[in-house]
Regions:
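Helix-to-beta-strand junctions that scaffold the AdoMet/dcAdoMet cofactor pocket
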Residues: 125, 221-223
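A short acidic, Gly/Pro-enriched loop at the edge of an enzyme's catalytic core
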Residues: 101-102, 166-177
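Polybasic, low-complexity RNA-engagement segments
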Residues: 1-49, 295-298, 305-394
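Conserved SAM-binding loop of SAM-dependent methyltransferases across substrates and taxa
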Residues: 113-126
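Conserved AdoMet
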Residues: 32-92
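S-adenosyl-L-methionine
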Residues: 135-170
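Mobile active-site "lid"/loop adjacent to the S-adenosyl-L-methionine
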Residues: 138, 174-216, 228, 232-240, ...
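Conserved class I S-adenosyl-L-methionine
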Residues: 103-112
Length: 394
């Protein structure tokens, strides 16, 4: 694999004396790891039936590196049963550092193919509400399948731009995870094809997209709620500089301290910043392949406002502003807009149903924890307005 000269120079500037160690690590094999799905099996039960030779991933008790080169976790029946998810070790960090409590409302903004969403669902333990979104319909279909295999409940898959979600979920979520689209520098070793993508669309292409996602997420996060922003790139333009911009744009956001685990490096700071800004950015987490078992990664945990001064809102799905209600409203609005834009003069077929629902004459079909998976096209296709959304029926 040949790295672009521009990238090599950027990494030399970033790593200094450690650059040679980084280049050497790029010749080593990527690690295979699995994350146990505690929605289906406890860690104690897994220890009794584990068919692989493994060792722990440093930053999560649910993660294990497979040490037997002959084993293939993707071929084992336990994989198809949803007992574990095959995931790159560093990719386990974002969902592990997002505080999730039973009953919370959680949003995974860029969720496909589902590695982080399935972990968030497991942390909710069958309660609360999980919205797993991906702008790509085809990728969202894979996401829905993985959530189903994982046994996720109270989950809904959407295929919307974050700005569109913002219209229906203002200050709604207790926790939001953004595993942002990025230049993928941290994945060059695992997927050399990412190098070509980097040359075509580098940090300068992705940084504005990431900021738009951050802005939308801020509007959807409730006071006192938590936000995790992560990338699989080393570029400060997509990492610390984006967070610095975000903090300056929204002064009520602050970076939270994340317990330091083996392999965690602090975020990059600059002498030109204020002491407070340097302190905040240093709390970011960086992963480098020459220092630990995973690929390159960046993650940061932020909070909106002061949690000690914020009273936790009720997370009951029976309250008036439930997830089901908001998704229904969003779906009706999208259908009505489509109808109006078509120029048809007749009354929308949705109007009567909406009036019945609002008057209490029609079942609201709220999310129910007894459902195997609340990702059902008969309920949610209004929110999935992209072409092909009807294929989400499971």
């Amino acid at each position: 694999m040949t790295l672009p000269k521009k990238y090599q120079q950027a990494m030399q500037d970033l790593l200094g004396e450690e650059y040679s160690a980084y280049i050497e690590s790029m010749q080593q094999r990527s690690q295979t790891a699995i994350r146990i799905n505690t929605a289906k099996i406890s860690l104690e039960q897994w220890a009794e039936i584990c068919p692989f030779k493994t060792k722990p991933v440093p930053w999560t008790e649910k993660g294990f590196l497979t040490t037997d080169e002959q084993c293939n976790p993707a071929k084992h029946p336990y994989y198809y049963a949803g007992l574990y998810y095959i995931q790159e070790p560093s990719a386990m960090i974002p969902a592990s550092i997002l505080p999730v409590h039973e009953g919370d409302r959680i949003l995974d903004v860029c969720a496909a193919p589902g590695g982080k969403a399935t972990e968030l669902a497991a942390k909710l333990r069958g309660t609360g509400q999980l919205v797993a979104n991906d702008i790509s319909v085809s990728r969202a279909m894979a996401l829905a399948k993985n959530l189903q295999i994982a046994g996720a409940v109270n989950a809904v898959v959407t295929a919307e731009k974050p700005e569109r979600l913002q219209e229906s979920f203002s200050q709604y979520f207790d926790g939001i995870l953004i595993d942002a689209p990025c230049s993928g520098e941290g994945m060059f070793r695992r997927d050399p094809h990412m190098v070509q993508d980097w040359e075509e669309k580098g940090p300068q292409y992705y940084a504005p997209i990431q900021r738009d996602i951050l802005k939308a997420a801020y509007q959807m996060l409730r006071e006192g709620g938590y936000l995790v922003y992560s990338t699989c790139t080393f570029s400060p333009e997509e990492d610390e500089k984006n967070i610095l911009w975000f903090l300056r744009q929204f002064p009520d956001m602050h970076v939270c301290e994340v317990p330091r685990k083996e392999g965690f490096c602090s975020g990059i700071t600059d002498a030109a910043l204020t002491e407070t800004e340097r302190q905040q950015l240093s709390r970011c987490v960086r992963i480098f392949p020459h220092k630990t078992v995973g690929e390159g990664h960046f993650a940061v945990l932020l909070q909106k406002g002061d949690s000690s001064a914020v009273e936790q809102e009720s997370n009951s799905v029976e309250q008036e502003n439930s997830l089901a209600e908001r998704v229904h409203d969003h779906g009706f609005r999208m259908a009505e807009k489509k109808h109006q834009s078509s120029g048809a003069g007749r009354r929308s077929k949705y109007d009567g149903t909406r009036q019945q629902r609002l008057s209490g004459k029609k079942d609201r079909r709220r999310m129910d924890g007894d459902n195997d998976l609340a990702v059902k096209a008969t309920w949610w296709t209004g929110c999935l307005s992209a072409p092909g959304a009807e294929r989400y029926r499971l």
